[in-house]
Amino acid sequence: MSAKAKNKLTPQQRKVTLNRVLHKIRPYSAFVVCSLLVAAVSVAAQLYIPILCGDAIDKMLGKGNVDLAGVLRIAVSILVVAAVAALAQWLLSVCNNRITFSVSRDLRNEALRKIQTLPLSYLDSHPSGDIVSRMVADVDTFADGLLMGFTQLFSGILTIFGTLLFMLRENVPITLVVVCITPLSLVVAGFLAKRSYGYFQSQSTVRGKQTALVNEMIEGQKVVQAFGHEAESLAAFDEVNGQLQDVSLKAIFFSSLTNPATRSVNNIVYAGVGLVGALYAVRGGITIGQLSVFLSYANQYTKPFNEISGVVTELQNALACAARVFELLDAEDQVPETENAAALQPDGHVQLQDVSFRYLPDRPLIEGLSLDVQPGQRIAIVGPTGCGKTTLINLLMRFYDVNSGSIKVSGTDIRDVTRASLRGSYGMVLQDTWLRAGTVRENIAYGKPDATMDEVIAAAKAAHAHSFIRRLPEGYDTVIAEDGGNISQGQKQLLCIARVMLCLPPMLILDEATSSIDTRTEVRIQKAFARMMQGRTSFIVAHRLSTIREADVILVMKDGHIVEQGNHDQLLAQGGFYAKLYNSQFEGVQT
């Protein structure tokens, strides 16, 4: 299915989207009313200026009887009215900007709050670049297009009715010439707007894909270059870029036809007014000043039709972007907490009872998993890639909910406690390090913002990060780049370990926590971990089996099941799957 067909909104969907937009604007009704009032003042002032100009012309066309005093008074009046119109335009801009930026801020805040309530499955299945595009580019287009377009639409309608009333007062037949020809521009604009709307929707969708691809390429540039995939990456980007160019050119082609097409209609109107008005002036039906007023009004009457047609196109694009933003806001939240969810009081006792889980309905990953972890035990989880090790960690943290069975901490089902208290009970160090853009100190104190400097330094020393931090240009005040590019992967992992060392929650999750650290530092870190894990229930996911010899219990997982269980020596003695895994990692060393 094409992007255009897939994203096309029905009239009912457009109506619903527009109603939601108006709901977002409602908190700023005072600014909206002010905007409409000053727009009306601006239109009235602009409509009054042609009358003054016409009067001035008539006062200068008498037979040797030019009223200079009258012309001067009119000139002063024109200056005053023009100043009022300019002031009104400035106030209109102030009000519109306030509404636009306020609504943009509110929407982005709402979108970020939404992301924090979305299930991990949504974030795993949607490119981060597309989500960023919805929060940034689509919100900007939506706010600018709808709010500014609405004001232009209102001003245009006022101008149309205002000029129509003034023209009818002056001369009905000439007015009919204007009224009969001008609607042609609406017919043309409506046809072009329908054609361009679908392309604007496709443009927004493809732009999201492009942002996601660029984000992916930038984050993985080292891997791309290491594997020599520059050409393939460029080809993929060129394909998406070509799609964006194609839909953008089609959208711009039809929207750009609007202005010349409506201007052609305007020229016909202007010529018709000039011809009919000249005939009336020759016969004495109107004065030259009145003809001048009519020509000016004819131009002002047709101008809003040009603007309205352009605004309609802009509104179509804005509605398409608004629909994408609301699609994000309407995404299904993670399973809500129970009404009486209590704060978890963990004692370290963790039970998994007949747990089953699958990411896809037809692909079971974990089936019938049961486990009883006593307080203070160190549980190592090993197995081949894809056996469910990290998935089990996600279930313990309730990033995903089990499909069946239950997970209990301190005898309480984790679905009956608050997520914040559950996740706050674990200290987590992952293989994939994440640091925020900020100072080293801020990153270490991420889980405890009120930590003193002494506490931060103590945590860094415990994680063996203090020595390298001291060598940084600003020490603990060194700013880490957004992607952590100014420190090594191992240093990033040390900071993540220090972050957990500072908080020391009652339970720990270490997912290959020392994978990016050199062997010498790893030995020291393992000793620090050993002290930290004393008395704390700890889950250790490891690929290097040499790191989990001291675990109280080693769970060997295969195809979502625990196939072996015991300590290191027991499992080696059994000569089963664990023994094969362990020996395979040391075959190269022994040979």
Across the structure, where does each feature detected by a protein language model lie?
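Transmembrane helix-loop-helix hairpins at lipid-water interfaces of multipass membrane proteins
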Residues: 32-88, 168-173, 284-288
